[in-house]
Structures are given as structure tokens and as C-alpha cells.
Amino acid sequence: MVSIRPDEISSILKQQITDYDQSVSVSNVGTVLQIGDGIARIYGLDQVMAGELLEFEDGTEGIALNLEDDNVGAVLMGEALGVQEGSNVKSTGKIASVPVGEAMQGRVVNPLGQPIDGKGEIPTSDTRLIEEMAPGIIKRRSVHEPMQTGITSIDAMIPVGRGQRELIIGDRQTGKSAIAIDTIINQKGQDVVCVYVAIGQKSASVANIVEVLRERGALDYTVVVSAGASEPAALQYLAPYTGAAIAEHFMYQGKATLVIYDDLTKQAQAYRQMSLLLKRPPGREAYPGDVFYLHSRLLERAAKLSDAMGGGSMTALPIIETQAGDVSAYIPTNVISITDGQIFLSADLFNSGLRPAINVGISVSRVGGAAQTKAIKKIAGTLKLELAQFDELAAFSQFASDLDEATQQQLERGKRLRELLKQPQFSPLNLAEQVAVVYAGVKGLIDEVPVEDVTKFATELREYLKLNKAEFIEEILKEKKLNDGLEATLKEVINEVKSSMLATV
């Protein structure tokens, strides 16, 4: 027979009383009423907040967007094949956040910050809210540093500054993404962190862009955020905010960052799809009433911070796709009014062989002029006007039989300027090369060169400077000014290259 020892029992009871944990966990739980098309209607969740993360039974996450009297409308961030009517949903008390930090560079992630490049987990513990308030007035300063794109026509006529929002707008297949990729490639060695956000694009296109960046050594300082065409609308809607959050981390550390949103038309369409399925009232072009706020709160996060805040910057290059060149549609006009200027790409110019196909007449940079380097500002001041006048004269001259000599001369120079500004893809030019090319055209030093040989002349001029005048390039890149001595050297080089070229023609 087992003997009972009272002292042993009392010590066990005392121990259990001591170890007793009285904490109570309260969770806000609801039930799925209806599920379909990436939208869930949930009963319960009385304490849920707008924009709060929800967790479904199968681990799928969602965001509460519609808070109604008797149900909550949520969008699902995943396939949600395991979510059924009657399954439980739990509110997390958190807002969506993404991992950020140095380890993100060189990686391809989805809008939740999860790696999709097959290189394993990203070793970072830092996170940042996807939706953050834009910096206030006191935290900012005016744009004053150049963000060189490496594309002569942009840096000379439509300059972009660090902290600016410059829209790239045009029809499909006019080279919008090409300009953005060239700008990323041109940041090599400039200590700029780049974020490329691909929204609703084909996976093959994104893979091609990643490969181009890798080949040119640009992936090392770039983060690619991809929400493909096959992803749920909620992820396409979130992708730009994820890109902004990743860039903000570096901006608040005092670094310069560049974010490409390719493209915001697809994000607006994803948001329209979500809103209509949530039964929000449609407005113009069936977009919801707050579609302006969708883009304004995103693009306002781009800024040049004050010195007290570390002096970092986020430059945004949003891309918008137009239909048949119609910039007066709803989304294009919204984004044009939010940004600090636009680069308009024309399908007609593209098809005529002018690449990049920039329509100088309606492209503008509202704040970039203050950031333009003195060297290019000094010589490119009249370039935009000359090209705009050339376009007008070219249209007029089709109907005029005899033109006066001054008009003919202007037309001939315009043709040569057009040829000088042609630039192949993935070949950005440095400041010194741009200065040399623009100077030759604007000063009329190549008026005798046949139009068909202008591109060849520009290539030979750049090669000559690299081989024989390396000190000229170094001086321009260092001082960013074109003084009288450098100007005399440049004029001498241009005439020398021109003479040797005309002798062989």
C-alpha cells in the first residue's frame, strides 16, 4: 500500500500555485461570411481598425479595408485556397510592415518583403511600416542636387534633382521602362540606392530587367519589388508602398535613393478592382473617389530632407501608360498634377527612329533647373527652345515651297541636334560626354557635318576625349563647370575630330 506524505503534497501544491500564470489573452475573432475574387466578408471583428492586418485559419494574411455596420470587407494577400465560409479570422493589432536594410540590396522580393529570387532568406531584423506619413514641411529642403540620368536629352533639357518626383508618361512600347533602367545603371559609383517596383508586369519582363541590371553591375545597389500580373490585386496595390518603405529606410540614414514605380496605371487598376468588389461607389472611369489620394500619399513620400534630418533624399520616377497618347485621361492628369514635371514619350517619334522618343514641347521639369550642374546649364539653355522651334518649322516647311536662308539654316541645325540626342539603350553618358556633345550642336560647330554622319561624329568625339583628353573629363566631373580654358580645349577637339572626319567623307 502506498503511503501518502502530506508534506510532499503540500510542497507540490505550493509550487503549482507559485507557477500559476493568470495572464488572459484576448483575441478579436470573426467568421468568414463570403469569400471570392480575393475579397472576404467577415462577421465579427468589432475592434478591428482600417488597414489592420488580419490572419485567416490557413495562415493567409489580409487587410481590413471596409468597416461596415454588420461586416468587415477585407482583401486577401495570397491565393487563400484554404479559406472557406465559416472559417475563423483573427485581427493581429498590427499594420503591414516589410523587412528593410542593407541586406535587401541585390535581391528580388514580393510586396510583403519575402524573397522570390531563390537565394534564401534575407538576413535582416529591421522592419518598416508599408504605409508611413510623408515628411512634413520643416523636415524638407528644396531640391538642389542633380540626379544624373545619363540620358543627354533629359539631363540637358528636363533635368531631374534629388528628391524630385518626375513622371515618365507615354503609350505602351515607347521606351518608358528603358529610361528608368538607364537611370539606375547610371547611378553606379554614385552611392545611390535604387528600388525598382514592377507592378502587374509579365514575369519574363521582370526576369529580363533583373538580368540586365546584373550584367551591368547595377543589381548590387538595387532592390527589385515585383507584383506580377498573376498576383492578387491586393499585392499589386501594395507594391509601390513597399518600394517606398524600403527606400525610406535608406533616406532617413542620410543616403540618396531612387525609386521607379513601373507602372502606377496598373496599381490604379488593381485598386479599382478591389474597390468595386468591395462595393464602393464608382466615380469617373469607374475609379473610386479616393484614387487621387492613392497616388498623392505615395509620391509625397519622395523628398529631399533637411540637414537636421540627415540630408537624405528619395527621388521618384513614376511611370504612367497612356492610351493613344491621351494625357487628359483621369489617372494621367492626376499624376501630372502631383509630380514636379513629366517626360512625355511619343509613339510617332519612337516609330520615326528617334530614341529616346522624348517630346520636348510638352515635357517639363518644374524644380530640376535649380539642381542642374553649371556646366550643362551654361550650354543647354537654348537647346529646348531651338528644338521646339525646329518642330514647328518642320511642320510648317512641309507646306512651304521656298524658305528664306535663316529658316533653312535653323531647320538644318535642328536636324543635327535631333541626331546628336539619339542614344542607344543601356549606354548612359557621363556629364563630360554630355557637355561635349551638346556644345558641338548648340554652338553650330557641326553645321558642315552631313546629317547622316552626326551620330558617328558624336561617337568619335567621345572616344577622342577618353583617349587623348582624360584630364578634360576629370576636370568637368570634378568641378562640374565649363570655364574658358576648358571651353577652348573642347572647341579645339571638336574642330580636330570634325576636320579628320570630313577629310575621310
Swiss-Prot record:
Subcellular location: Cellular thylakoid membrane
Residues of the site described as Required for activity: S363
Enzyme nomenclature, EC number: 7.1.2.2
First-listed, main subcellular location of the protein, grouped into a coarse class: membrane
Source species, domain of life: Bacteria
UniProt cross-references to Gene3D superfamilies, sorted A to Z: 2.40.30.20, ATP synthase alpha/beta chain, C-terminal domain (1.20.150.20), P-loop containing nucleotide triphosphate hydrolases (3.40.50.300)
Alphabetized PROSITE patterns for the sequence: ATPASE_ALPHA_BETA
This protein's UniProt keywords: ATP synthesis, ATP-binding, CF(1), Hydrogen ion transport, Ion transport, Membrane, Nucleotide-binding, Thylakoid, Translocase, Transport
Binding-site residues for ATP, renumbered to this chain: G170, D171, R172, Q173, T174, G175, K176, S177
Membrane topology type: Peripheral membrane protein
Quaternary context: F-type ATPases have 2 components, CF(1) - the catalytic core - and CF(0) - the membrane proton channel. CF(1) has five subunits: alpha(3), beta(3), gamma(1), delta(1), epsilon(1). CF(0) has four main subunits: a(1), b(1), b'(1) and c(9-12).
Family: Belongs to the ATPase alpha/beta chains family.
Function description: Produces ATP from ADP in the presence of a proton gradient across the membrane. The alpha chain is a regulatory subunit.
Protein name: ATP synthase subunit alpha
Organism from which the protein derives: Prochlorococcus marinus (strain MIT 9301)
